[in-house]
């Protein structure tokens, strides 16, 4: 049992490492492709990768094949739930996150995204009528102050575009909706199946937007050698491996405990931003990250002890 618990926590940490890196990979790709094209190709790569995994697993296990045949009907029965989940994430979430990142810096973007666990209990209070404690509220205030601390300079002026802030917080709200939909899906399907189905539906959502945005803002598809590696990394590691690992951790730990891992995203992003793209991390950003993480831990610890 202890070994299984270690595996669950390991999956959560690895997922956050890949998502921390995804902010850097996206920044690299955005130098050549517009966000919509990046997301569309990212989902195509993910669907191909996950499809191959499912095919190999199907070939190597008859029991798995029989189980999947039985689950085909169940997937059709819950197609509306899959469609809603995919609308939240990857479709809307990727749009807001990508355009937010385009108008911000990786570390600041990841710190805002890390506030998702703060808004989850607030949404649960209104939608699921779950109790909202004073520790939820206190943690929310502290973390929010941390985000503001990172967004303002000494003259109290914004260090990033207001447009980027709006996009990123929109991504946070969408992710909260996705967490609520995912809660039911993890009780019915395996993590790999959930990730595969939601990415296929998400890719379908992006098809018309891809053709519209390519006409408005053409991408530099010709220079593929300059961005193929980070693009493949987004599709394989961020959209496939990370989502599958996190869905597994989510199914074992529940929403509150699983969302705690989001605290690690800005930490990993800050570390890898310095190493890979040479982003400067000053004391103000470090203090902001610490406030965000401190507030998140404060709000979650009391929930878990209840």
Feature map (PLM): residue ranges:
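Hydrophobic transmembrane alpha-helices of multi-pass small-molecule transport proteins
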Residues: 50, 132-153, 206, 263, ...
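Helix-helix packing/entry segments at the starts of transmembrane helices
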Residues: 16, 39-41, 94, 108-115, ...
